Amino acid sequence: MSVLIVTSLGDIVIDLHSDKCPLTCKNFLKLCKIKYYNGCLFHTVQKDFTAQTGDPTGTGAGGDSIYKFLYGEQARFYKDEIHLDLKHSKTGTVAMASGGENLNASQFYFTLRDDLDYLDGKHTVFGQIAEGFDTLTRINEAYVDPKNRPYKNIRIKHTHILDDPFDDPPQLAEMMPDASPEGKPKEEVKDDVRLEDDWVPMDEELGAQELEEVIREKAAHSSAVVLESIGDIPEAEVKPPDNVLFVCKLNPVTEDEDLHTIFSRFGTVVSADVIRDFKTGDSLCYAFIEFENKESCEQAYFKMDNALIDDRRIHVDFSQSVSKLWSQFRQKDSQKGKGNGCFKCGSTDHIAKDCVGGPSSKFIVKDQNRQHGGGEGYEMVFEGDVHETPKHNSHERERSEKIQRRSPHGNGEGKRQHRDERDDGRRQHDREDARELERKHRERKERESREDEDRRRRRRREESRDKESRRERDEDDHRSHRDYKERRRERDDRHGREARHERRDR
């Protein structure tokens, strides 16, 4: 009376005590025959104590006996078959994991060490492992969480009955599947934080070159995600355009038109931009050449590398910049967020930042003459005032001319002198205002420049920290993989030695 249990870590052969525990052995054999245990997890592994399985839900709270399937819900559990001569004295003892007195169903456990005598008299012992102690050792050494659930799932793959002394009930034939089920049981509670039983470490599955490539791809993706989060690129998966060349080592005197003329012999050049310092306007000695199609770009790449332009040997490569794509992305995003047009003038062919027009101003110049007051010469008006202002100004001018004609001193020399002095004072005031505006503008530019430099410095520091953290994570991953392989190698060597000793002892 034996059963072969195939697990994800190896095979186990169990000899059953069918003469002393007929109810339990019949229940176990018939559940194996209907493939009830296929896919069941070892949901509880307590090192040097027990390994429990037999629950299709994988929680330790489920499971039914064969008698429930044969006779109904009232027969879900059956009574204990405890014998004093069947003890937990040896490693590999097989017993029922009952929920209490006479509450046996489908769950059972293996003992993982000798002399667990305090379990005697509490659980039904119905078998003993005959072969597969190395598999039992692997189960015992599994890494588990604080609830004794293995981090990597250990499953029963198949069960094969080697000897069955009990006759099959008539209803059993209807319960037997046509083929042995594979995978997870339908009743299993989903748990996404576990490694599946067929998972293998990446360094064991891939070669050294493939593993390095995978790690490099992950690092590149992480960098792209960081750049996306800080706003340097529109999305992590963005790719640079394939029709743009990067040209460096240029002579500072080389102009955009020169590059446009030189590279035009390979195809239509859409743009040739020499990058310049935003303050001084001096060339930074590199440029971007955009072609109309990819073929022209590739031809220029092969022909122009190390070419001589203005006494300089230039270097040509495919552009990795996504600046233009990022600008287009932001422009589309701005249009999408603002109604596909300019909110200033209402036009749909441009956005607000490119608008040079706009609605009629709410502020207009009422009078340039400071003797009438008005501070800066601007007053608040309403919509209707904008169209009435010219007529109002003409009336004011006529009234002023009449007053001057009636005045006895209207054309006097003193009047003219006073007006000249007033004009000189106004011009001096305007020059001071212009200098003040220029000073404020210069200060604002300097402040913006400092802020831009601070942002670039912070971005470089963040990228450096991210790069260092990725390098440390990669080193930790390599170290953990090496440790894991070393532990597995030591464990396999120990299992081999123990198996040889056992065969020698027999």
Curated annotation (Swiss-Prot):
It is found in: Nucleus. InterPro entries: CRIP, Cyclophilin-like_dom_sf, Cyclophilin-type_PPIase_dom, Cyclophilin_PPIL4, Nucleotide-bd_a/b_plait_sf, RBD_domain_sf, RRM_dom, Znf_CCHC. It holds the Pfam family zf-CCHC. It comes from the Eukaryota. SMART domains: RRM (SM00360), ZnF_C2HC (SM00343). It catalyses: [protein]-peptidylproline (omega=180) = [protein]-peptidylproline (omega=0). A zinc finger (CCHC-type) spans 341-357. The keyword RNA-binding applies. Residues 388-404, 412-506 have a biased composition (Basic and acidic residues). One of its GO terms (cellular component) is nucleus. Keywords: Isomerase, Metal-binding, Nucleus, RNA-binding, Rotamase, Zinc, Zinc-finger. Residues 243-321 form the RRM domain. GO terms for molecular function: peptidyl-prolyl cis-trans isomerase activity; RNA binding; zinc ion binding. Residues 388-506 are annotated as: Disordered. Residues 1-161 form the PPIase cyclophilin-type domain. Ubiquitous. Belongs to the cyclophilin-type PPIase family. Component of the BZR1 complex. Interacts with NRPB1 (via CTD domain), SCL28, SCL30, SCL30A, SCL33, SC35, SR30, SR34, RSZ21, RS2Z33, RS31 and RS40. PPIases accelerate the folding of proteins. It catalyzes the cis-trans isomerization of proline imidic peptide bonds in oligopeptides. Influences somehow regulation of RNA pol II (CTD) phosphorylation. Binds RNA with preferences for GC-rich sequences. Probably involved in activities connecting transcription and pre-mRNA processing. Involved in brassinostroid response. PANTHER family: PEPTIDYL-PROLYL CIS-TRANS ISOMERASE-LIKE 4. This is Peptidyl-prolyl cis-trans isomerase CYP59. The gene is CYP59.
